[in-house]
A protein has these predicted regions:
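A structural signal for leucine-rich repeat
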Residues: 1, 17-24, 40-46, 61-68, ...
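Conserved hydrophobic beta-strand positions in leucine-rich repeat
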Residues: 4-9, 26-31, 48-53, 71-75, ...
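Extracellular beta-strand scaffolds
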Residues: 14-15, 36-37, 58-59, 80-81, ...
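Residue-level detector of alpha-helical recognition elements and their boundaries
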Residues: 19, 32, 41, 54, ...
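Alpha-helical recognition domains of nuclear gene-regulatory proteins
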Residues: 52, 85, 95, 101, ...
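Membrane-proximal C-terminal cap and juxtamembrane stalk of leucine-rich repeat ectodomains
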Residues: 122, 127-160
Length: 160
């Protein structure tokens, strides 16, 4: 099992990532639609490239310091309130954060800007309170903060 490269355990009522530490060769981890409330136990998974955490009860993005190979981070439909602790994920190309509780979109560049994430291509933020409160300004605001992206939510970004 220690040579396992992909683990897909969706819809299993998982409440913690206990026991996953020996799987150091994991590249893809999908734990969607479970009962996680906290991100922990990923420290030894330094080869991880794709992490799918959607539809859990995660409240905070944290404990990803050792997962610097991540190219995809999906934490849609959780209870995350702020985008933080991701600046070091410089290889990230896909950042899916839609349908959370993120109210403030004013500092996206401080966490996801091109100086930190030059490969960031796709960002999903729709369905957050911040998107709703920005109204018609939402798309433009995100594009100005993240000029490197080619897709915002399900729509391609026009380059001016």
């Amino acid at each position: 099992m220690t040579n396992l490269e992909e683990l897909w355990v969706g819809k299993n009522k998982i409440t913690s990532l206990q026991g996953i530490a020996p799987l150091t060769k994991l590249r893809v981890l999908s734990i969607q639609s479970n009962r996680l409330t906290k991100l922990e136990g990923l420290e030894t998974l330094t080869a991880l490239e794709e992490l799918y955490l959607s539809h859990n009860g995660i409240k905070k993005l944290e404990n990803l310091e050792h997962n610097t190979q991540l190219t995809t981070l999906d934490f849609c439909a959780n209870q995350v309130t702020t985008i933080e602790h991701v600046r070091h994920l410089s290889r990230l190309s896909q950042f899916w954060a839609n349908d959370n509780l993120i109210a403030d979109l004013n500092h996206l560049d401080a966490h996801l800007g091109p100086q930190y994430m030059p490969h960031l291509d796709t960002v999903y933020l729709e369905g957050n309170p911040g998107q709703k409160s920005e109204g018609a300004n939402y798309r433009r605001k995100v594009q100005l903060a993240l000029p490197q992206i080619a897709q915002l939510d399900a729509t391609l970004v026009r380059r001016s």
